[in-house]
């Protein structure tokens, strides 16, 4: 019954308003800007190839930063072990991201990508099956925090926004690293992408908010970036979608990745 209702909603002509939750982070002197090489030969790559990973659903929460970072960590671990990928609890990541950004989890208002990367560097990540957190207001137990400390990233870098397309291709193709990205959402365009699986400009609609996603590949055949979303498997191509160069360059807020020796 719920599935049928959702399918009917996605067939409506009026654009849907989506749950988002990413704030634009202003570049400052705290940042380590990723250095990139020019002239990367574009070729298709899919960091989720052979990995049994399903898109998640953030429901009506603003926890997209936690979901996107969880996907990034799964991809990193899959580089070490594709046959048995780990799923990471997004509520744990979202908890620490908000604590670092706002000092509280009283409000489910989203977070910043900087604090999301910082959260996993400082407090690690929890394997889903070992975690009791099941809502955006849950607090981790001391034993869970101790367990998460074993899975920390060593460093992270901001991608240069002024040459974001080249930076994304370099990071994905040359370094084979996933990217945590935030984009402005234009409801009509993202509603169309939910049906076609491709995000591209289709007008001058105002931006309605920011949304965090994970970039995991590049398709040379149509010059698009592959991305995971957190709006469930009924959206896009079973929860995944492609981003056109025009949309990425126009609506990118900020983007980050881990250092090459990430664990």
What are these regions (language model features)?
Residues 1-51:
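Non-catalytic, low-structured ubiquitin/UBL-interacting segments
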Residues 3-19, 42, 57, 66, ...:
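Predominantly the structural core of cysteine protease catalytic domains
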Residues 50-59:
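Immediate flanking context of iron-sulfur cluster ligation sites
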Residues 62:
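Short alpha-helical basic/polar micro-motif
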Residues 74-93:
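Phosphate-handling active-site elements
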């Amino acid at each position: 019954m719920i599935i049928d209702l959702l399918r009917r909603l996605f067939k409506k002509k009026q654009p849907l308003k989506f749950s988002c939750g990413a704030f634009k982070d202003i570049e400052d002197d705290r940042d380590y800007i990723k250095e990139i090489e020019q002239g990367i030969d574009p070729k298709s790559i899919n960091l989720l190839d052979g990995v049994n990973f399903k898109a998640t659903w953030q429901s009506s929460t603003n926890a997209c930063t936690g979901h996107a970072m969880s996907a990034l960590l799964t991809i990193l671990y899959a580089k070490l072990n594709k046959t048995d990928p780990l799923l990471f609890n997004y509520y744990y990541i979202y908890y620490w991201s908000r604590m670092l950004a706002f000092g509280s989890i009283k409000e489910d208002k989203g977070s910043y990508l900087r604090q999301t990367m910082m959260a996993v560097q400082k407090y690690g990540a929890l394997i889903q099956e070992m975690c009791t957190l099941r809502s955006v207001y849950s607090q981790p137990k001391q034993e869970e925090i101790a367990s998460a400390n074993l899975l920390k990233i060593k460093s992270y870098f901001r991608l240069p926004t002024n040459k974001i397309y080249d930076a994304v291709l370099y990071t994905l193709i040359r370094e084979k690293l996933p990217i945590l990205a935030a984009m402005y959402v234009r409801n009509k365009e993202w509603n169309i992408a939910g049906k076609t699986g491709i995000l591209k400009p289709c007008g001058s609609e105002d931006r309605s908010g920011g949304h965090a996603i994970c970039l995991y590949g590049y398709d040379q055949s149509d010059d698009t970036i592959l991305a995971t979303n957190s709006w469930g498997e009924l959206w896009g191509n079973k929860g995944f979608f492609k981003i056109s160069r025009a949309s990425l360059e126009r609506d990118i807020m900020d983007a980050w990745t881990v250092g090459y020796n990430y664990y």
